[in-house]
Amino acid sequence: EYLTSGGIPIEDARNYHLAGCVDPAIPGKASFLAGNFFVVPKVLEVLLNDGVDPHTGLEAYSFKPPIEGIETFEEFYKAFESALSHFIGLWHEHSFLSGRPKDYYDAVEILETVLVHDGIKVGKPLSRRKPVPPNDFRAAMVPVGAINVADSLAAVRMLVFDEKKLSMKALKQALAANWEGHENIRRMCLQAPKYGNDIKYVDSIARELYRFLIDEEAKYCTFGRPEHGRIRGIGGASISSMFAGGAIIGATPDGRYAGTTLADGTASPAQGRDTHGPTAMLRSAAKIDQSSCASTLLNVKLHPTSLASREDLKKLGSLIKAYAAMGGKWIQFNVVEKKQLLEAQRFPERYRDLIVRVAGYSAYFVDLNKGVQDDVVRRTEVSI
């Protein structure tokens, strides 16, 4: 549906393959250039600090009046959307500049021309043809930590605006202190509704946030120039960006500590926040409009005893089919005990052959850096 909505003929769309990790492309009829990551919680962090990035101390966004003067959640969310739109625009300027070198490397274009359909006959790569063929594919923007933002917005909405248990000033002080001395406020934030549990209060925020991201991306073409490809979309291959992205983000209103890993993928709950079982998790993920995304990614960690029998395998198959029927695009599993992962961290020489799914790719667990290992360990372990 995503491909045909972009003008790709149905016969080509049905012949798609996966470029990179989870992004669809048409073999022999599409060029591919990896997209960039967009760390969504950074926008919320800057907004909560009245336009200043506390990581650098620099003013990154002009926002007035002070965030503490906002009286309704609707006003707060509108301010967040305005900031998000601003930073997405800056992100596209960066994307444009980072893509410019490709325009000057003839060897790249020659290779691309030779490998695509009708390339030798036409004598031009896809990006140089006018009009650019609808099959020309450029990787989408990958929003990192959007689920952390949904959880954070739900906490702000409930505690500051709906129930008025907390002032914005008190929340900002707790975040600035990385919760030290404000453990009671962190406890309140952790108890707020969390995505992944089939709770409308927070799932509706996640859905609305992704809808906004999708609509904003639809305003841009690859590198900001219509002649260089189709309109961009949202991608799901977070790879290990949740670790690097989290390293530059302070504490967030979802109860997360500064510098810790963000939620992986694009549809996965934040680590350990889904407590109502796999069915509730899938229902939350299915509320996101995945048909408008180039790709999405949902990671699930299963306890090995969940797949002990043939009947258990049938249950897993039914779970996957149900998710697809609800509109889910991509779901993947790690079948491993938390105990085994912790053991592998202590004695890596004993687990050289232990393979796990990280994002859209598999890797030897002991070869991953400690931060990414910890992310896999902390994912909720469920049974079916």
Predicted regions and their residues:
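Conserved catalytic cores of very large enzyme subunits
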Residues: 1-384
